Design a protein with these regions (language model features):
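Acidic/histidine-rich catalytic neighborhood of metal-dependent amide-processing enzymes
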Residues: 130-204, 412
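Acidic/His- and Gly-rich active-site-bordering loop/insert found
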Residues: 2-123, 146-151
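Glycine/serine-rich anion-binding loops at beta->alpha junctions
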Residues: 120-135, 221
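Short beta-strand segments
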Residues: 94-96, 158-160, 189-192, 216, ...
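Structural motif
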Residues: 89-92, 121, 156, 186-188, ...
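Metal-dependent amide/peptide-bond hydrolase catalytic core
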Residues: 1-9, 16, 193-198, 203, ...
């Protein structure tokens, strides 16, 4: 059969996997894989299920666990599954096992940790982020197995822990302790971001800075405010003052989506429990996604300038801590082989032109790029990650599986 005929056969087989994909999503959703940083049990149960499924397909599976005494068993799983090709050069698809917490349960229409199917839509925590990548890549390999095709490159599936809280127990651990797994001429695909049309190939990310602000004042009875220093009021004014960051670091780069830096207040920690007490301690967080043209040290210097002004104005003490600080690595070249392979595959499946772009969100691809490994992030993304009622369209899941199958069987 010709390569085109082989791919047509793969597409037909994958189109018949609808129920199988639903069944796997169901098994993944109910195995809660929230990490210990978010008071969860970790990824062990999900990894054990997937390791068994991969071995059932005949793949060689090895676990490279990262020590972590915060989870049962004391380890975070990192699975590597290989399907031998005609050469040792590899095509990698890296997905992550962990999910974020459910958030406000009242905003969910159904149980977040039980799959709900409504027509072509699948609902549940993790169905998109990142079960989409897990399911699409596994069923692409399954289709190859059913057709008996041997790919030119060896296919590697990496299922890693800890993506949602920094990757130190996941990909960062693998790259530090097992750098031999990945090579510069490998094609590395990370299905963890994109747009609904599947036309965005992410090759660059903004720098990421998460800041924790601790505001200290003096607690007192709310009827005697002159006896205290209200940290809630000081925090509110500080949050508003931090809007100066967007004015200071105001460059626009259309290559990125969105094209400007963002500085968003997000989490607030609980202070006092009762209404009639003025809080003497306030803690809030700022999520900064900064265009690579800026150095994060300059952003932090501006933050210190703003907080110093707020300290003087409100008679409080403000300490700032960088919870996460990642200066953007060099971008993957727009003409890299992995980008070209994805463009050809997207065109073949969706009849659309996928373009390389930069994004504001952080993905594990940054760790690859920092090691000089050109990775591309791509998926047909429903844009519901981290939201209540997270969902994925089954047709997009099937289509993306076909895209990965095209890369597997057509790339040399």
């Amino acid at each position: 059969m010709t390569p085109a005929e082989n791919f047509n056969r793969l597409q037909e087989i994958i189109a018949g996997y609808r129920q199988g994909m639903i069944d796997m999503q169901q098994q993944l959703v109910r195995r809660v894989a929230v990490g210990p940083d978010n008071q969860g049990p970790g990824e062990a149960a999900k990894a054990a299920y997937l390791a068994a499924e991969l071995r059932r397909l005949g793949l060689r599976v090895q676990n490279y666990p990262a020590p972590d005494d915060r989870v049962p068993g004391g380890q975070r799983p990192n699975l590597i599954a290989l399907l031998p090709g005609r050469t040792a050069r590899k095509v990698w698809v890296l997905s992550h096992l962990d999910v974020v917490p459910q958030g406000d349960r009242q905003l969910w229409h159904t149980d977040p940790f039980e799959l709900h199917v409504d027509g072509d839509l699948l609902f549940g925590r993790g169905v998109s982020d990142d079960h989409h990548g897990i399911v699409a890549s596994i069923f692409a390999v399954r289709a190859l197995q059913e057709t008996g095709l041997t790919p030119h490159r060896t296919i590697g599936l990496a299922l890693v822990a800890d993506e949602e809280t920094g990757s130190q127990k996941g990909l960062a651990y693998l790259l530090h302790h097992h750098p031999e797994l990945f090579a510069a001429d490998d094609l590395i695909i990370v299905p963890d971001a994109g747009n609904p049309e599947g036309t965005l190939i992410e090759i660059a990310e903004k720098s990421m800075l998460w800041l924790r602000f601790e505001v200290q004042g003096r607690q007192c009875h709310a009827s005697k405010p002159e006896l205290g220093v209200n940290t809630l009021r000081a925090s509110a004014h500080t949050i508003v003052a931090l809007e100066e960051l967007a004015q200071e670091f105001n460059a626009v780069e259309p290559f990125f989506d969105p094209p400007h830096s963002t500085f968003e207040p997000t989490k607030i920690e609980a202070n006092v429990e009762n209404v009639n007490t003025i809080p003497g301690l306030g803690v809030f967080y700022l999520d900064c996604r900064v265009l690579p043209v800026y150095d994060l040290a300059d952003v932090q210097a501006k933050v210190q300038q703003i907080t110093a002004q707020m300290e003087r104005r409100w008679d409080v003490s403000i300490t700032t801590q960088a919870v996460q600080e990642v200066q953007a690595p060099p971008a993957t070249p727009a003409a890299a082989p992995v980008v070209q392979a994805l463009q050809e595959a997207v065109q073949a499946v969706y009849q659309r032109r996928a373009e390389p772009r930069g994004i504001g969100g952080g993905t594990v691809a940054a760790f690859f790029r920092r090691q000089g490994l050109p990775a591309a992030v791509w998926m047909s993304d429903a844009l519901t990650a981290h939201q209540p009622n997270e969902c994925v369209n089954l047709n997009a899941l099937i289509g993306d599986c076909q895209v990965l199958a095209h890369v597997f069987c057509q790339t040399r």
